Amino acid sequence: QAGGDQTILKVIEQAYGKLDYKNHFYLERGPYVLASVVDESDISKDPLILKGNYIDLFEPNLPVLKQKVVNPDEQAFLFNIDAVKNKKKPQVLASASRQYDEQTGKRSYSFIAKSPAETNNVMRILLPKQPKNVKVSAPTFISEWDKATHTLLLQFENNPEGVQVNIEW
């Protein structure tokens, strides 16, 4: 029925109070953030600007961002590093693999990463301190430390049998 949505909105406003209309959807579940800005809105054409320490899960290299701008007709899937409860505990925050046999020592963290062959792994690992030694059983790997978030970016070729990762700080 034409105009039925206005009737429903009036009933909701009477029951709950003033409604705040926005051009975006925003959802947090634990450290995960989903955001979408619609371009069909008469309310606003403004982007949604999120500030904090985020890993952009839609980007293949898992960049760390201080700010994410979500424009109309765009979506974002982020990991909020600031929402991690125990930042002293080494942990994989985002990865293109499953981790097995995780071992945490006073100054070390190790695990086996398994994922399909002929694919690349990109992972971001939260560590209590900057690593002094990183060993990966893959033929080659790239590691990059982000001082501001205490996260280590690791990239290497996956192996379904497992890639051993050993980190010491």
Regions found by a protein language model. Give the residues of each.
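Solvent-exposed beta-strand/loop surfaces of large extracellular or lumenal domains
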Residues: 51-67, 135-155
